[in-house]
Amino acid sequence: IIIALVILAVSLPFVFLVYQKYKPYYTAGDFGITTVVSEVDANQNGIDDYQDILLGARMDADNHPTYDGRYWSAGYPPDDIGVCTDVIWRAFKNAGYNLRAMVDNDILISNEEDYHIDYPDSNIDFRRVGNLQVFFSKYAQSLTLDIYDISEWQPGDIVVFNGKHIGIISDRRNRDGIPYVIHNSGQPLREEDVLEKRAKIDPISGHFRWNALELEDIVVYWEE
C-alpha cells in the first residue's frame, strides 16, 4: 500500500501536467467575440502587430527558456534564459519594436521618480515589471481589469499582476471564455489557463493594448 501511495503521489503531478497541456481550449469565435486586428504591421511581414506580439510570446513559450533573473551586462539575456519581462520584449521584437530603447528613452525624458528608480540602467530597466507598467500606462491603451468582461481581453494584450508579474494574453480561452496567459515564472507550461487563478493571488494592476498609430513620437523599431 505504501509503495502504491508513493507511486500515486509521484505520478499525479505528471498526470495533471499532461491534462493541462492537452485539455481542450476555445477561441474567440466560440463565444461570438470578434478578434481585434491592429491597423499597424510595423515589420511589414503581412501579419498585424497584435498577432505578431502573440506569436512572438508563443515562440518564447515554445523555446521554454530557463527562469533566471540575473543581470546581464549586455542587457539582453541569451535565448535560453529569461523571466516574465523577457517574454514581453521578445514579443515586441517579433512585431518589429525595440521595447528596450523605448523604455530607455522615456526614462531619460521623464523624472526618474516616475519609474521608481534611483538611476537609469539600460541593461535592466526594460526587464523590470514596474518599469514596464509605468511605460505602458503612459503610452498604451489602458483597458478593463475585469477578467469576466471576456470580449475586452484580446490576443496580444499585456497583463500585469500587482506590479510584480507580466504576461501576454493568448488567443486560447477556457470553457468560460477567459483567455490563457503566455508568461514565464519558471512553470512547466508557459501558455496556460491561469488568468483567473493568478488574479486571485496577485490582483491585476494593468491591462494594456499597444497601438503604434498613436505613438509616432516615441516608437523605436527593431534593427538587427
Question: How does the language model describe each region?
Answer:
Residues 2-16:
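Hydrophobic membrane-insertion alpha-helices, especially the h-region
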Residues 19-135:
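N-terminal capping segments
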Residues 67, 135, 161, 207-208:
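Aromatic side chains
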Residues 94-99, 173-175, 213-214:
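Bacterial peptidoglycan biogenesis and beta-lactam-recognition machinery
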Residues 47, 108-187:
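...with weaker cross-activation on analogous glycine-rich loops/strands in unrelated enzymes
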Residues 177-224:
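Low-complexity, Gly/Ser/Thr/Pro-rich intrinsically disordered linker/tail segments
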